[in-house]
Amino acid sequence: MELPFRVLVAAVVVGLTVPTVFAGLSAYESQQLSVRAIQTIDAIVRVAQEIYLSGGGVEDVRVDLEGGITARIELIAIGDSQDGPLAATARYQISGQGEAFLISDPQVPMTGGDGALRVGPGRHVVRVSHDGEGPVRLAVVG
């Protein structure tokens, strides 16, 4: 009779602690993914700034937006359409959260062609190019 009672107590304790552990893991992963999204945006925007200020060029930036167990980077969007009001901005979204906005400094206009460069979960190669005129062009090439 004592063994089934111990098993029952153990099951209750596990049942009470699992949601707390899961919530903590989810919060930790969301925070880590937010840092990774900001670092990714910073890497792309820094290259765009260097190319824009130097008068032109092309460079590829590798990005890793793989997700975790409880959260993932849903979207990174950089720039806007040509001459769009958000051309010097970037935004990202982690699953279960609202979009976070960032502004490049110095402000450099960037475009993904018809609008913002949009990158979802996974590993990608982003080509950053500028021909000396207009905004810096961003494209996913791999």
Region annotations inferred by a language model:
Residues 69-142:
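Intrinsically disordered, low-complexity regions enriched in Pro/Ser/Thr/Gly and acidic residues
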Residues 51-72:
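Short, glycine/small-hydrophobic-rich surface segments
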Residues 24-30:
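Aromatic-capped interface at the extracytoplasmic side
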Residues 30-43:
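Alpha-helical transmembrane signal-anchor/signal-peptide segments
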